[in-house]
């Protein structure tokens, strides 16, 4: 299983001018990273998942009040990982593509952002890359992560499906460590 060392850190550069969503979008697009632009635009021009939960509870009523707020550091982190993934894909460096998407998935799933649905989006990209390249350890890790995030969201059926796939891959590879990890998660989600 690929290990992610905690939550990725976001470096702070206090001397740089504060970018806007628009300026970063333009910079990404002008640099020729079309897919990165699309993903960045979506990530920075959507409703705040926390505010959306507030709508259900009746706490917010205005669309403008629900727009996600993204700091300069977060924009830099997203831009760097998205463009690195796209550039690496062009070069055929699938390990770096996987790692960049994994960084984004972990970032959105954990910490203050706490947006597991966006984490799922990037873990699914990891799974896609792993399948395309026959990366068994990467596929096991992505299935494990998708199972865990679906568990976190309360979607037991999906969690079980991903953990069972993780178990199948672990058995096929003969990795007892992976089988143990998949079994542990299956027990957690089943109880």
Name each model-derived stretch.
Residues 1-191:
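Intrinsically disordered, low-complexity regions
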